[in-house]
Amino acid sequence: MPGGLEKTCHQCISKIASNACFVVVLCAFLALPLSMTFIGMKFLEDCPIQPLIPLYLLVGGIVGTLKVSLLLYDSTRMRRLLSKAVVIDDDDDDEYPWRQNAHRYYIHLLLSLFLFLWFILGNYWVFSVYLPDFLPPFQQPQDYCDKTLYLFAVGVLALSHTVLVLLLLCSGCVYLCSRWRLAADED
């Protein structure tokens, strides 16, 4: 049974990844990590109360750009293969291509794991100084964070939380639908 679920998930992901709309969505998603990189570089020295906030944006933006670029490459590669009418038969050894390209699978896995851990660290760094002074105070000029930088970091985290919740909800729905389908097939 797990093999059937794995095959179904693979077919679903292949259909989504080969869709032209998916490529457009990935290109739109590329704007966020690029802007994170830009904001992180521009305001690198402008948050002395928590100097890791611009570093969070800079590193997260660079790694996020790499991750989305690899996804775009894989998606366009899959579209090219499908346009050449490369069909994966059920009896073919290439039924699960990520097993054939284990290095690419592990690169995606490591990048995703790093981004998730970086997201957790970013939450700590940003919210540990929640609503800092946006202008340097006269008595303690090191206790401030640039308003654009800080609010952008909070916005990135809010968007990340939203996407994470939506992914969890969609994953739960897919799991429930597959369980109902398996139960219906058994009856």
From Swiss-Prot:
Q: Which gene encodes it?
A: TMEM272
Q: Where in the cell is it found?
A: Membrane
Keywords from the named record: Membrane, Transmembrane, Transmembrane helix
Main localization of the protein?
A: membrane
> Transmembrane segments in this chain: where?
21-41, 52-72, 107-127, 149-169
Q: Which GO terms describe its cellular component?
A: membrane
Q: What InterPro entries does this protein's entry cite? A: TMEM272
Instruction: Please name the source species.
Output: Homo sapiens
| Protein name per its UniProtKB record | Transmembrane protein 272
What is the protein's membrane topology class? Multi-pass membrane protein
Task: Please spell out the taxonomic lineage of the organism that makes this protein.
Answer: Eukaryota, Metazoa, Chordata, Craniata, Vertebrata
PANTHER family recorded? SI:DKEY-19B23.12-RELATED, TRANSMEMBRANE PROTEIN 272
